């Protein structure tokens, strides 16, 4: 595959044991494990013809993920440090990377006198997972705090969605 020859800061591992990446410490190998350090690396990886039409699982903190001992016959994408950030925007809102731990978002909001994120302090996992599952507790959930999200499709296309366009559970 050409992707293995491309210069990337990301890592591609074959038959990587998944027990190392979830809280249950269970799971056999992933056929391909891709630790992504940039959007451009993910795009290159997804554009490679050898990676098309394969099952893909995007892994966050692994707090709500259970892999079979038989492994995963597909691609596991683990977002790296570039995707773990929280920053204050000029309009008073915050931008959060998908790999950012929920607790870090709650702490950042508290430090910046923003309310409505307190519930995240007791939810394990990342914001990416919180959005997918509409995580919440104590009468709050993440859908009440989102203005918009930006995603990368499995075809490598960046897409933005306003919160009212998202069908939360």
Where in the sequence are the language-model features?
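Phosphate/pyrophosphate- and phosphate-bearing ligand-binding catalytic cores of soluble enzymes
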Residues: 13, 20-23, 65, 152-154, ...
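Structural signature of FAD isoalloxazine-binding scaffolds in flavoprotein oxidoreductases
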Residues: 34-39, 66-84, 132-162
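Short acidic (Asp/Glu) patches
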Residues: 103, 133-135, 164-169
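Short beta-strand or tight-loop elements
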Residues: 115, 145, 164-166
């Amino acid at each position: 595959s050409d992707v293995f020859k491309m210069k990337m800061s990301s890592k591609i591992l074959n038959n990587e044991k998944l027990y190392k990446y979830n809280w249950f410490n269970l799971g056999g190998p992933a056929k391909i494990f891709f630790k992504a350090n940039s959007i451009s690396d993910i795009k290159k990886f997804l554009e490679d013809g050898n990676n098309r039409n394969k099952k893909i699982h995007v892994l966050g903190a692994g707090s709500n993920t259970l892999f079979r001992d038989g492994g995963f016959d597909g691609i596991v994408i683990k977002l790296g440090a570039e995707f773990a950030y929280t920053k204050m925007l000029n309009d008073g809102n915050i931008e959060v990377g998908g790999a950012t731990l929920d607790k870090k978002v709650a702490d950042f909001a508290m430090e910046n006198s923003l309310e409505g994120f307190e519930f995240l302090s007791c939810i394990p996992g990342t914001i990416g997972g919180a959005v997918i599952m509409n995580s919440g507790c104590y009468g709050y959930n993440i859908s009440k705090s989102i203005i918009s999200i930006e995603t990368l499709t499995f075809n490598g296309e960046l897409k933005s969605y306003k919160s009212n366009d998202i069908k939360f559970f």
